[in-house]
């Protein structure tokens, strides 16, 4: 399934595979993600203590976090989920949230933070367009921590379409890049 998606993405280039009859406005982006959590303190310790997000607001049943002063990039609440368990495998729902870092050094710093916290990593990949680290948060939500290469460096075929790549990244080199911060 993932390979099918990679093939579909590689053929899409930067032109949609299917254009909506009434396309959404260019420039629309995802402003924030709001997730249910079993434990506000536990997600606070991970997202603030390990990844380094700033707390914008904290209440007994909700937490709002930001990277760089936005009103919030991530929201968490226990309104319907306090003490709950993650959804079982084989059900629909969130696959992962990608957190994009501005530089390779910043992604290397994130990897260092995870290593320092002894946080388990599910995998890592160099996709050609970006490098990514995959992991699970305390509620078992999938996270992709990623750095996008400049678009001019993205791999393309002879017709100019994006090529999907999946290679093992040099994690030691990525960690060393954090020294540039």
Language model regions located:
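Short acidic N-proximal helix/loop "leader" segments that mark the beginning
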Residues: 1-27, 158-181
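Short coil/loop residues immediately preceding or within conserved phosphate-binding loops
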Residues: 30, 60, 94, 130
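Mature N-terminal segment immediately following signal peptide/propeptide cleavage
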Residues: 28-38, 54-55
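Conserved short beta-strand elements that form part of the metal-binding/catalytic scaffold
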Residues: 7-13, 54-91, 142-149
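Histidine-centered active-site/metal-ligand motif
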Residues: 32-34, 71-74, 96, 127
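Vicinal oxygen chelate
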Residues: 35-41, 98-154, 162-181
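Amphipathic alpha-helical segments
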Residues: 39-54, 113
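Short secondary-structure junctions
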Residues: 52-58, 121-124
